[in-house]
């Protein structure tokens, strides 16, 4: 099935004109069919809108935007990118989307602040013939494509790592863990939470659990303060934190409570600060999600959708994911990787995500990792 966008319709009109010229003796041909993930580029440019959700998490401005822009330039050198960040405000993202649609974008790549609220954006885009690619978070409303990571597996990876740490320390039966989950408006957070519970339930006692609006590190710190009061600092043997930013808040709360030997704390996103906490022994692990292939896939989907082609998923292949409205969305899901001190060099360093110099700043130069890395 081909998907017809406004740009694709204009391209079809151009193709019809070219065929008329061909009948008059001018040589012109058109091609169409199924778009494969790869290195082929589109000659005619169009306008692509990219909406990212927030800037508190370092990845979006540092990696997602530049990686997407790099891939789009490679796939469609003449394309024009319109970009906005919503700063975790759903209403702001709505206004940004409306402005882009008014400007005349031909395809929208949307990382929703609030998946349910984003259905309005999706419906407005569809009403104007503009296809929508859901990026990292699945917006409701029946988007054309979705690319993310296997989010249930992310939670499993975090839960498995936390259990492993507790088993290594022999503390799994000696106390309780605290769970600091992500934002209740982010469907990914629900998947992380479900995956973690699948691993942790029945294996450890969960003394306190919180959902954290806006993925706020400050809110996470407050929640951890509450958990320390209700559970007791000495009873907390581990903390499931859904991402690195909140892990920073968790660790700050533990330190403020006078906890000298920090329990294992999980994270996600492989932020540079998270990696540095791992090598400093403050955070047990993080989850590395290879953003470059995610951004590349989103760009491939956007180009295919805007030109009326059907994206085949490339090497990863397509699966289907059901959104909140029961729509089955063609999707690419990328596998996450657990990162501890032992495999930092084999993951984020070998992939070029960070260099040793970026990780081993003066404050961390004396850690075992940096000493061994030279």
For each feature predicted by the language model, list its residue ranges.
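A residue-level marker of the well-folded mature domains of exported/periplasmic proteins
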Residues: 2-10, 24-374
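Bacterial N-terminal signal peptides
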Residues: 14-24
